[in-house]
Amino acid sequence: MTKRQITDIDNLKFEPFDNYGVVVPGMSWHKISYSRENGGQGTYVLKMEAGAKSLLHEHTGFEEFFMLEGELTDPDGKVFKKGDFVSFKPGSQHSSHTKNGCLVLVFMRGINKPL
């Protein structure tokens, strides 16, 4: 099948995370099907190094993610850990940080707006 794509999660090629128009230190991604050109739809794997923090942003559409490795903490103190599936509704605002690093499978439906 020419329209099938298989991604080997153990052998990804990560690039600096620049989804907000600037490179965010300590964050990198491997785009699977995600594209800003198609309205921010698709999937990517996000890698955050120890001590990394995402920019404060608002979700214009749903964002869902599955924690593959490590832990991620939101400003309210909620910790997402390996095996957690998290959903953010449109209009939600947050930033996240990781103490020891993490790997996250992200499903996007809309472009996040930096705040």
Show which residues each predicted segment covers:
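A short, N-terminal "cap"/entry segment at the start of jelly-roll beta-barrel domains
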Residues: 1-40
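Short beta-strand segments in beta-sandwich/barrel cores
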Residues: 53-54, 70-74, 85, 112
